[in-house]
Amino acid sequence: TSKGKNNFKNFLQFSAITNNNVSVSQKGKYGSFRTSLTHVFNKGQYPNQKLNKITYTAGGEMSYKNFKLEGSASYNKRVSSNDNGSGYSGSYIYDMVIWGGTEYDVRDYKNYWVEGKEDEQQNWYDNSWYDNPWFKANEVVDAYDTDILNVYMNSSYEITPWLKAMLRGGLDFYSKKNQWRNAKSANYAWDKNGFFGISRNSGYSINTDAMLMADKTWGKLNMNVLAGGNIYF
C-alpha cells in the first residue's frame, strides 16, 4: 500500500462556518427604522484559509402629510487570510491528486523548513516544480481586504393630487487591498528569491434622478406627463 494514498485527505483540516446577527427595529406614527449587524466567519478546509465578513445595514422610511422619504445604507467588509490554493493554478488538488505521487506521506513535511535553513529553504522532495503544500499555505499568500458601501435615498412630494415631484439618488463605493507574498525557495509563485507586493483599487459611482410626474383627467381625456433628468458620475 502506498504510504501517501491519503495525502490530500490528511492535508485537509476541519472547516466551519459561523453566522451571527443582531438587529433592532422601531416603528412609529410617521415612519420606521431598522438596523442590522451580521458577522460571518468561514474557516476553510485548507490550512491558513479564513474569511471574515461583516455587514452593517441601516434603513428607514418616514411620511408626513404630502412628503415621503425612504433610504438605506449597507456596509460590507471582507478580509481573507489567503485566497491561494483553489482553481487551476497552484491548486492543492492538482498538486497532490493529479500531478503528485503517493510515494511520500505529506504529514512528514508539516515542518516545512529545512532544519538550520529556516526562512531560506523549504523542506520538500521536489526543488524545481511543486511546493510543499504546508509551505504554500503559509508562505505563498494571496490575502485581500475589501470594503463595499451602498447607499440610496428616495423622496417624493405630492404638490397637488395630480402632480408629484420626486428626487432619488444612490452611491456605490468599493475599496480593495491585495497583498501577495512568497518566501524564498518557492518553486511555483511570484519569485523564487522571495516576493512582496501590495495593490490598492477603489472606485465609486453616483446616480441621481429628479422627476416631475403629472396625471390629470378631464372627463374622458387623460394626460400623463413625466419630465426629469439624470446625473450619473
Model-derived features: positions:
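Residues on the lipid-exposed face of transmembrane beta-strands in outer-membrane beta-barrel proteins
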Residues: 16, 22-26, 56-62, 151-157, ...
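Predominantly transmembrane beta-strands of Gram-negative outer membrane beta-barrel pores used
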Residues: 10-12, 19-41, 57-63, 70-72
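N-terminal entry motif of extracellular EGF-like repeats
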Residues: 6-7
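Outer-membrane beta-barrel channels and translocator barrels
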Residues: 17, 28-29, 63-67, 158-160, ...
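A conditional alpha-helix N-cap/helix-loop micro-motif detector
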Residues: 13-15, 146
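An active-site-proximal structural segment forming one wall of the substrate-binding cleft
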Residues: 163
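Surface-exposed loop/interface segments of Gram-negative outer-membrane beta-barrel transport/assembly proteins
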Residues: 1-2, 44-51, 55-148, 166-233
